[in-house]
Amino acid sequence: MRRRCLLALLLLPALLAGRMAAAEGVLNVYNWTDYIDPAVVERFERQAGIRVRYDVYDSLETLEGKLSAGRSGYDIVVPTSEPTFARLVKAGALRALDRERIPNWRNLDPRLMERVAKVDPGNRHGAIYLWGTVGLGIRLDRVRALWPEAPLDSLDLLLKPENAARLAGCGLAVMDSPTDVIPSVLQWLGRDPASADAGDLKAAEGTLLALRPHLRAIPGSGALVDMLATGEICVALTYSGDVIQAAARAREAGKGVEIGYAAPSGGAHLWFDMLAVPADAPNPAAAMAFIDFLLRPESMAAITGTVRYPNAVPASRPLLAEAVRDDPTIYPPEAALARAFVPGTPSQAAERARTRLWSRFRASR
């Protein structure tokens, strides 16, 4: 038995090299802005002998539009589990993953993977990359000065018109993502976050239109991080990790801008971003090798340490800096996760209605 284990250990580097050698050429990745540690990509290129061409987007609508047109040319994409990933699975737009080429699949947290299995039975088409919540990015120094009793852990802070009017002078923003914003508004209104009911959508639109005159911007993810970090805005509805990135940049700038994140106490929108391979990917072998490389604990620790989003590889946690590992805004406590909701996947008709709603919201003043 010992000899067999020793032989397996001796052969392991050769087996890994062989698996990576089977995936040659160029890997085309399409991912969110500021959503990976560049050093991880560089290590993959060195070890696999595969050049990575890396493009970025800052909204799910941009990603889905590119994939819906077909022949995107990408080997790896990173759609959010619901609704984008769910729709792509249903449409047959994603390739089933070859688990034999992804031995590090075993590192994934089965509890989290079970959450996405409802839209991808058997987890055949995707592995969780990173996850997080949608909540409030707050410039704490300004908001506390303006309103010491402000309800920082509630969407009331932004969505109640009288509160928005009170804080408008220091800059308010909502990320340009109907997929993420509308479910949060519906939840705040006490409605089903995945509702297709015309009355529910009208109520959500009314809330957004009442907020619109007080907004300084409706930016994409990357621009919103910059606006928070520089203090241009003081309250934003956005992704948890974007706020944490903005807080880190603000500290580095040393100008006294203090940024914090608050998940709504009534329940936050929980999302999972998935590593997936388009059905017409030009280099699926390289895609499987890249997914396997990312699922190494050391890779995921480096990524979480850089972008400040939690990952789904528990073995990476001991490798994280204590300040990251123990930060409840990065890894929420179990009680907060129990209150969180995954918004579900609206029907195509409901999605079209939401898109029209969002267009009217953006165009209004």
Predicted regions and their residues:
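A bilobed periplasmic-binding-protein/Venus flytrap-type ligand-binding module shared by bacterial periplasmic
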Residues: 137-142, 187-190, 271-283, 302
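Periplasmic-binding protein-like
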Residues: 201-211, 218, 255-276
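Short beta-strand->loop
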Residues: 95-106, 253-269, 278-281
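Extracytoplasmic ligand-binding site segments that recognize negatively charged/polar headgroups
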Residues: 80-85, 89-216, 222-225, 229
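A ligand-binding cleft/hinge motif common to bilobed small-molecule-binding domains
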Residues: 83-87, 235-256
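Conserved C-terminal helix/tail region of periplasmic/extracytoplasmic solute-binding proteins
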Residues: 334-365
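Early extracytoplasmic/lumenal segment of secretory-pathway proteins
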Residues: 24-89
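Mature extracytoplasmic/periplasmic domains
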Residues: 278-339
